[in-house]
Amino acid sequence: LLNRLLREHKQDPDKLTVLDRLAIVGKSGMGALTYYPEQSFSEENDNTDLDELAFQCQKILHTEYSDKLDELYRLGGTSGGARPKIMTTINDEDWIIKFSANVDGENEGKMEYDYSCCARKCGITMSETKLFPSEVCEGYFGIKRFDRISDISGTKRVHMLTAAALLELDFEQPSLDYHILMKLTKIIT
């Protein structure tokens, strides 16, 4: 997504240094790390139509042109992961809202929401989840940002790292099982 955005802004992605790319991530990335000076390509836009953003994500996944590239990048283009997502604020609360990928069924959001409710009923502590409404599917899965903690003194960023990133694995290639994840957890805690 970043490379497409750079090309749209007449910049060659191959000529950017690692520091240039970190400046583009700026303060929009997941976790506690932020990068200064920040370089931004897009303006703030509070008009978030989830169905339209999901449609634009599908166009990009199918390597088609999207006229919402700036907005999609600003809302979550640095977050990575297996599925397209946005990071947005709704009613003064920070949320991650996920859209379906090419390999998903059209009601993946509802299924993930149901699993989150099941996990909570089983006693698993996790961030608040919500099924955001849609006119084209059963809804989009949302989870309150788990890399932010809010209290009376404000919002603090929380360090986080995925197992795939820590082990330098391709998240698209299944290579971990629970035994490895438990060993990793024991090593780092």
Regions found by a protein language model. Name each.
Residues 1-189:
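Phosphate/dinucleotide-binding and metal-coordinating scaffold of catalytic cores
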